[in-house]
Amino acid sequence: MKKIWVIFTVLSILAATHISPVQAISESQSEAIQELLDETSKKSGETGLSLSIVDGDEVIYFSSGYANRKTEEPVTKDTLFELASVSKAFTGLGILLLEEQGFLSMTDPIQTYLPWLSFEYEGSPIDMQSVTLNNFLHHTSGLTNELHFQDIPQGNSQDMLLKTVEGLKTSQLQFLPSQQYQYGTVNYDVLGLVIEVVTNKSYERFMSDEVFQPLDLNDTYLYQADAQETGQMAKGYRPSFFMTIPYGAPDFAGNKPAGYIISNSKDMARWMKIQMGQIEDIPDNFKRIIEKSHKGNESVSADDGLYYGAGWLVNSDASYIEHDGVNPNFSTQVVLFPEDLRAVSLLTNSTNVNNIYIIDSVQNILEGKPIEPYQRSGMHLTDIIFSSATIIFTVLALLFFMISLRRERNNNQNRISKKRKVVIGGLLALTIIIAILSLIYPMFIGYDWQTLLVWQPYSLVTALLSLTAFCASFTWYIWKYPKIKPYKKSN
């Protein structure tokens, strides 16, 4: 009887150990991560954040901020966000699946599927037989954000993907195909259209039937309307004058394969575990193509030590895999450490968060290292700079305007000297030049005005306007400045 009791006790302990594994993340680490997110939400203009961590067999979720500030709906692991360019890994998997199934080869020329597509380089047509599907997969086609980002049309009709790629016909390439890597989001729109041509299905239907369902990604959506129906879709915000404001960005349905898949932290955790080979209940062919998707294109130079795979940036031995994404009112970051079976995903509903800082800080917390002081995102800093400039130039413009107006009413002005006429002429010319430069400013950053108004903070526009107003006001101030009479010595 005693032996039986000992055996029962041992088995009970083993069973309990199996059911309740030791927590990989300590309570103090959890508190530090939550504090990090709360601080980030507050300093980034009340941004909503949803974080998922895979650490071995454990999945931990953290959240902070609001999915909708007006209704005070908090962010949870179920909250849906636009994945932005993290969407590319899904599209990359889809195109590799078609290759695995024998429908295409990534070495096929693009004209095999889109015979009407043609490009030019330095004004001359290029041999389209030399442009393969791999060029689009690895961003070596010559289509880049610098030249082709603003070509993405707005709209949500069923043919927007076709319209988006048709807009690339006869595009001027930034470099000859296969010569170098340079990121261009439209490359994955081309792949999305190839999926439609090969399967005779919409991109959305193919991805839902052949990728999301087999992988059991049940909270991942391709249509904004479907996501809204769940009641879990986060409201997007954009930076504006030291805060974030609600922003309903235009529809870019033609850019869906590159940047507009929608998901939540629960599905992203499963997605990361699938990427690291921790999920067994998926078709075997996915295991093969996922491994293939992590192979970076080493035929061109690395970008900061990373090569581009199929929707992923990877180092040479695939021990570090990541991708980020930014839409007008959402941003994301996913980082995988396959050798450590650790991965982190961050979803946010504004562009004010420095996502890679959060990911690095979480990694430091998990490794027991100190974290760096809070670092703002580039977009947040842009808004701070231009908002500050707007205030300064507006105040100065009003000040000089009021002084000049008072002098105008008092007729407090003497005859204008030739010297002052030269100064006024120079200031007037400067005002005109600044006004012209403000009008063409988007060209300097690779945008047009329509694109700039969608993607950049409104404070950028007001800063340019207030600078022009300041120059005009200061010119009038000099015009109205009273002439100083020369001092005459008394006898």
Q: Model features per residue range: what roles?
A:
Residues 9-13:
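Hydrophobic helical h-region of N-terminal Sec-dependent signal peptides
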